[in-house]
């Protein structure tokens, strides 16, 4: 997550393409608002609704989890969170070598994680471990989370949010890795050049998750079906 620019300097702005929203790197002051929009974006996500079945407090639980991820995982690991100027969507990326979640985040001191998942925290931690075991090992950029406010979905915001990460990966000649938790998100990632790497079966009969990889532009890199 970026530090605000010094007074008098121009902010960093990404303009993905004609007709697409301009983006900016989020600051620590955006965390609460971005956690709220991500909670809204993932309110019907198959993985989260399975992890927290029938929860009447699903949205505040998700908000707490996303805030914790940004402040305890993405930010300390040299990550960047891109958002639109209206905070309609957000994407959290991690650079090569920084994708592993700190042990302190899922260990005994992870109070905010426990607050978010409650009695389901042990299962949530098993899901995280399963994803880490399957994670791409070669150097890559990792898109940890991407979400668009429900009222703004289907308008190209998600595609625009992905552009800074994909451009950085292409410049570095490295692939980009992401996990799709729904067929709809997998279809979006396919349109952006990602290919499937098999299916990840979650513990205790959880819904499928699709690891996906996008080779750098001009590369002959092919994803293995895992």
Where are these regions (language model features)?
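A short beta-loop-alpha structural element at the N-terminal edge
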Residues: 22-36, 40
